[in-house]
């Protein structure tokens, strides 16, 4: 799997970054053997493995599993980059189920609380490395879902305080980077405008878009922002490009089920029907189209893909190296399945 230089750093990143929410028991408690095999397959994909994780994933369980699996596989730390999204800290579980994202995480033995501030983010970073365990540390660091933290504000004053918390967290991360303790800092968010707001205030090395730059949704102002990042050597990772699986046949669109009595939701369902019909006509898998589109803008270095099945790890890597016929993209434009003036395909 080919690697691309990460902005102004000396690091190279592959076309696929491996997501790890399933290792933290998102929706399913996989056997340890399955989790180990998923990790084993990462190393079949290329020379350097980039792992995207977070303290929120299973209240730290994903970090523990990653560390245990890497040691079991005798992985070379020089060939592994762990990207840890910080902002949630493991705490004892004192209720029947975790208090964060009820119903999403299965079989957890700990809870997690949000800690976004200068001191809070350092606590999350230290705990994250402790959970990874001997031999491995997080080299890419970011604040986890700052858009949601800002959206929870109850007033303009509260939002300003929350932004100060976020900027305090980034001050701490920048100090770690400047000291050479981590190699790069970034931001990931479902709301790309929150990324743009933080980008104005923080010197970032990378950003991770989620649910934002997809075949279904690619506003021109976002493409302009990605171009601006590219000019400044800020690398873009793209993620959640299937809209929570909906564009490849899943039931949920952006983590919710559609209400077909709602006109906007009917439009989404109609889009998918027309998209699937075009894919069938050209003998294209919907996932192939979603991934090639997501990687097409200059500046998008990698795509984050995750799987609960070991055998899908390799197929995910193949998705990132598949080129579809130009005729497919031209017809997608003719059918208004993508912007007619989209410059990078068709």
Regions found by a protein language model. Give the residues of each.
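An active-site-proximal structural segment forming one wall of the substrate-binding cleft
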Residues: 114-137
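N-terminal binding-site loop/beta-alpha segment at the start of enzyme catalytic domains
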Residues: 1-97
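Beta/alpha (TIM)-barrel catalytic core signal, keyed to glycine-rich beta->alpha loops juxtaposed to Asp/Glu
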Residues: 3, 34, 126, 130, ...
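Short glycine/proline-rich turn/loop motifs
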Residues: 19-21, 47-48, 104-109, 149-152
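Active-site mouth loops of central-metabolism enzymes
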Residues: 21-33, 106-122
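Generic structural signal for well-ordered alpha-helical scaffold segments
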Residues: 40, 67-71, 125-130, 174
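A solvent-exposed, charged loop/short amphipathic helix patch at secondary-structure junctions
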Residues: 101-111, 156-159
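Short, flexible, mixed-charge acidic loops at enzyme active sites
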Residues: 93-104, 250-255
């Amino acid at each position: 799997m080919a690697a691309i230089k990460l902005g102004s750093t000396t690091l190279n990143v592959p076309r696929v970054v491996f997501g790890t929410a399933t290792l933290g028991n998102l929706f399913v408690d996989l056997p340890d053997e399955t989790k180990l095999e998923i990790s084993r397959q990462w190393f079949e994909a290329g020379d350097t493995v980039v792992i995207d994780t977070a303290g929120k994933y299973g209240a730290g369980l994903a970090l523990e599993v990653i560390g245990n699996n890497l040691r079991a596989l005798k992985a070379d730390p020089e060939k592994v980059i762990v990207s840890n999204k910080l902002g949630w800290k493991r705490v004892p579980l004192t209720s029947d189920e975790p208090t964060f994202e009820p119903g999403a995480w299965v079989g957890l033995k700990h809870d997690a609380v949000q800690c976004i501030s200068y001191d809070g983010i350092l606590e999350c970073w230290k705990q994250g490395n402790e959970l990874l365990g001997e031999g491995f540390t997080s080299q890419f660091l970011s604040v986890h879902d700052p858009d949601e933290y800002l959206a929870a504000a109850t007033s303009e004053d509260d939002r300003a305080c929350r932004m100060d918390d976020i900027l305090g967290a980034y001050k701490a991360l920048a100090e770690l980077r400047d000291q050479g303790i981590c190699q790069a800092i970034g931001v990931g968010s479902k709301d790309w405008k929150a990324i743009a707001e933080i980008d104005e205030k923080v010197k970032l090395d990378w950003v991770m878009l989620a649910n934002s730059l997809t075949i279904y949704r690619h506003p021109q102002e976002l493409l302009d922002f990605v171009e601006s990042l590219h000019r400044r050597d800020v690398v873009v990772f793209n993620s959640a490009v299937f809209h929570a699986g909906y564009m490849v046949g899943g039931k949920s669109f952006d983590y919710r089920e559609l209400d077909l009595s709602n006109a906007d939701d009917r439009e989404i369902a109609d889009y998918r029907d027309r998209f699937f019909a075009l894919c069938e006509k050209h003998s294209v898998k919907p996932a192939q189209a979603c991934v090639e589109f997501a990687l097409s803008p200059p500046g998008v270095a990698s795509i984050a893909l995750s799987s609960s099945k070991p055998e899908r790890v390799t197929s995910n890597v193949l998705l990132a190296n598949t080129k579809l016929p130009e005729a497919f993209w031209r017809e997608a434009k003719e059918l208004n399945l993508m912007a007619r003036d989209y410059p990078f395909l068709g």
